[in-house]
Amino acid sequence: MPLTRGRIVGYDDERLAFGFTMLNDGETVDCQISDAAMDELAGVRGSPSTARQGQFLEHRDAIENIASRLFDASRPVKGAVVRIFTKHIPAFRRDTGTRSW
């Protein structure tokens, strides 16, 4: 079952990732997308950390779709974080027939 939209957590300077939550039957699922994965999805390189929230909002539907697919493909463990890395972007594009955003 697909996850549903949660809230924006924001940028984590230590992990170089943008955090957000999604919901699974009312339970919060923590999610993150790496800087590199977000740039890959957007078709750019080296975006500054100050641009991450705007970048996330612009590509939110795709990012949440990827997180939901990763969650559904795994054996969810309570408290585990769904992490999106660059390796997940080509598979998403292949599955959706999308070349770039």
Where are these regions (language model features)?
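Short, charged/polar N-terminal "headpieces" of proteins
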Residues: M1-E27
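A generic short-segment signal for beta-strand/edge and adjacent turn/coil regions
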Residues: M1-L3, C31-Q32, T50-G54
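Short, exposed beta-strand "edge-strand" segments with a Pro/Gly-rich flavor and a Y/T-containing core
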Residues: R5-R7, D25-I33, R75-T86
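Flexible, active-site-adjacent loop/turn segments at secondary-structure boundaries
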Residues: V9, A36-D39, G54, V82
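A short, structured beta-strand/loop element
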Residues: G19-V44
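Acidic, low-complexity intrinsically disordered segments
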Residues: V44-W101
